[in-house]
């Protein structure tokens, strides 16, 4: 059983709009609808985490089988996914997706899910010519993933890394629940980072797999109307 958990609670202040960020359009569909449509062929259930303008987001998708999860306070990506814990089946494979990344393809998600099968955990990364602003994938000498370091917390050497975290991952429900409950706000923002579960999994000797997306455009988040 596969389940999608889509983060859609962001206010999108840089969009300079009163409309919820995920409701802005690409073509004739909202950002969120693109993500839902890409995930549906390979999941059995869809959970969408909402906060800002939640009623308008729900109204946009009337008639679709979606479980709505409310995030009352925005305390980081880890906190957002924590709100979905009651709806996570321990035996399921959870696809963590973002409602403002509309160009993600079903085929990419399928490959990511397949990579997660041996260990129960895989990350989607991409190589960027200019990785400024993105979390870097930290690997050891054997190319195994060790952690993800956010831009604002990275050292000078880590900032030179071009492989970045897209935020999209596939993880077994048992692992996700375990590590979500262990999250602490040990960063400059005082938030709960979802990416911190990577380091926790490494400490548990979980061999985290990865799939490197060929196109940076496919995993690009929409932050401005012009994008």
PLM ranges: what are they?
Residues 1-17:
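N-terminal nucleotide-binding beta1-loop-alpha1 segment
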Residues 2-6, 32, 45-48, 224:
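Hydrophobic targeting segments
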Residues 7, 26, 97:
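Catalytic metal- and UDP-sugar-binding loop of GT-A-like glycosyltransferases, i.e.
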Residues 25, 103, 170, 221-222:
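Short aromatic/basic micro-patch
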Residues 29-99, 103-109:
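Conserved N-terminal catalytic core of the sugar/cofactor nucleotidyltransferase
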Residues 104-188, 206:
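Conserved core of the sugar-phosphate nucleotidyltransferase
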Residues 199-212:
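Catalytic donor-sugar/metal-binding loop of nucleotide-sugar-dependent glycosyltransferases
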Residues 216-227:
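Extended, small-residue-rich solenoid/repeat segments and analogous flexible loops
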């Amino acid at each position: 059983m596969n389940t999608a958990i889509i983060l859609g609670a962001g206010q999108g202040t840089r969009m300079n709009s009163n409309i919820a960020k995920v409701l802005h359009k690409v073509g004739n569909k909202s950002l969120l609808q693109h993500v839902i449509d890409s995930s549906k062929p390979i999941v059995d259930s869809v959970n969408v985490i909402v906060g800002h303008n939640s009623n308008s987001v729900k109204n946009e998708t009337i008639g679709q089988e979606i479980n709505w999860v409310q995030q009352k306070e925005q305390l980081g990506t880890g906190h957002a996914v924590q709100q979905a814990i009651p709806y996570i089946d321990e035996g399921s494979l959870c696809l963590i997706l973002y409602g403002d990344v509309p160009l993600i393809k079903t085929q990419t998600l399928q490959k990511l899910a397949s990579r997660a099968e041996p260990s129960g955990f895989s990350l989607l990364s991409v190589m960027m010519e200019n990785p400024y602003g993105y979390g870097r994938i930290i690997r050891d000498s054997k190319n195994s993933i060790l952690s993800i370091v956010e831009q604002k917390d990275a050292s000078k050497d880590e900032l030179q890394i071009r492989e970045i975290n897209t935020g999209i991952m596939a993880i077994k429900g048992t692992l996700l629940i375990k590590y979500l409950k262990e999250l602490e706000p040990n960063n400059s923002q005082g938030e709960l980072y979802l990416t911190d579960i990577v380091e926790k999994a490494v400490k548990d000797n979980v061999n985290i797999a990865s799939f490197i997306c060929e196109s940076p455009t496919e995993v690009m988040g929409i932050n401005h109307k012009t994008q």
